[in-house]
């Protein structure tokens, strides 16, 4: 497995080894020892799968308290996956990193606890899978406006399809600091 660092500390791109031939391919998507050696701490307690159509944008989401680390991958199709550092006191607060994940490149992205996450679908459809280090808890859910001008995320699509809930989230600057995770605490 190849592990690539990103400009956000703790956010990793993982390229699993793929064993392929004329029949198809095989790859390992999780091995506790191998992934811990790469710097990904579990345990993972919940797996989710989301199906979306072209142009759908989901995010930006996080939980605090009970922040979730996420290991994400695309099973079919292609998405542009984004992580945003929203940890108060972090040297990279307000910065984001994005990467294309697809069934063709088999890449995974690890987003550590305390960062916001979102993605948009670039292919006709996409099947998106993610492992979480804590359970979904709607009482601690935080959303950040996907097109926050201060974040200035280039989503690679012109007119995304956004849920009514995601469309009315506040900008990062409008969220009280005490509501956000603190750098070093998660």
Residue ranges of predicted features:
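Non-catalytic, conserved peripheral segments adjacent to functional cores
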Residues: 1-107, 123-125, 130-186
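Short beta-strand His + acidic residue motifs that chelate non-heme Fe in jelly-roll/DSBH
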Residues: 109, 117-122
């Amino acid at each position: 497995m190849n592990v690539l660092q990103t400009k956000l500390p703790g956010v990793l791109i993982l390229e699993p080894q793929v064993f392929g031939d004329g029949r198809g391919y095989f790859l390992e998507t999780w091995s506790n020892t191998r992934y811990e050696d790469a710097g990904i701490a579990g345990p993972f307690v919940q797996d989710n799968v989301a199906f979306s159509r072209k142009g759908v944008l989901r995010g930006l989401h996080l939980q605090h308290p009970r922040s979730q680390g996420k290991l994400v991958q695309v099973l079919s199709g292609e998405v542009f996956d984004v992580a945003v550092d929203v940890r108060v006191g972090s040297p990279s607060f307000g910065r984001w990193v994005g990467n294309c994940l697809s069934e063709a490149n088999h890449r995974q992205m690890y987003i550590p606890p305390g960062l916001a996450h979102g993605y948009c679908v670039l292919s006709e459809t996409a099947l998106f899978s993610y492992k979480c280090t804590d359970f979904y808890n709607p009482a601690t859910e935080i959303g950040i406006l996907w097109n926050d001008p201060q974040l200035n995320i280039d989503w690679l699509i012109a007119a995304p399809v956004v849920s009514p809930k995601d469309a009315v989230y506040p900008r990062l600057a409008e969220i009280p600091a005490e509501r956000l995770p603190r750098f070093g605490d998660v």
